């Protein structure tokens, strides 16, 4: 392979990797422009090494190692915050950037361009569709989700904490408060336990976690938790 052919393959990998990275950078993701570009260039370099090695009898060996190696980098951008897992789409984009770079290293430019376009369509065009689907209730099964929230607060702040809890729950759509009870934990009324039973027409784990996190910041709240109970079909 001539040096100008290697330069062409690396340049195409640079351009396509940057294209994928711009979309991630625009959404302010952890792995953005530079990361996706470097992944594509690195994958292309490894494949070029394989091509330049005349005695290499297994042309798929290097791409297989690239697929394995990119898993460590992709795993580093996946974060778990409470019940929410973030970074899965960014990790998948990194994986695709490695594939695009591998194609460029092999000189398969048409396939690399087509793959990049498909990744961009998946990240941009399918985003509104996935958001729309996530917000749709499950009409066919009409699931009814039950939750139970517990919190312990100071007795003199019970009324204020109950008000904050009710106001926070009121901001969540399709949710009903089944009961709200409280009882003293000691005879001197130093601490009170408040228990709220909630019914939703769909899973509201993320919203309840936000409510609980907000209440936990209140200095008068000693402890707070929530749990999902059984799901009943209507």
Curated annotation (Swiss-Prot):
Keyword list, A-Z: Cell membrane, Membrane, Transmembrane, Transmembrane helix
Keyword Transferase recorded: no
Subcellular location: Cell membrane
Pfam families, alphabetized: MgtC, MgtC_SapB_C
Entry's transmembrane regions: 32-52, 62-82, 106-126
GO CC aspect terms: plasma membrane
Main location: membrane
Membrane topology: Multi-pass membrane protein
The family this protein is said to belong to: Belongs to the MgtC/SapB family.
PANTHER family, per database record: PROTEIN MGTC (PTHR33778:SF3)
Protein known as: Uncharacterized protein slr0014
Organism: Synechocystis sp. (strain ATCC 27184 / PCC 6803 / Kazusa)
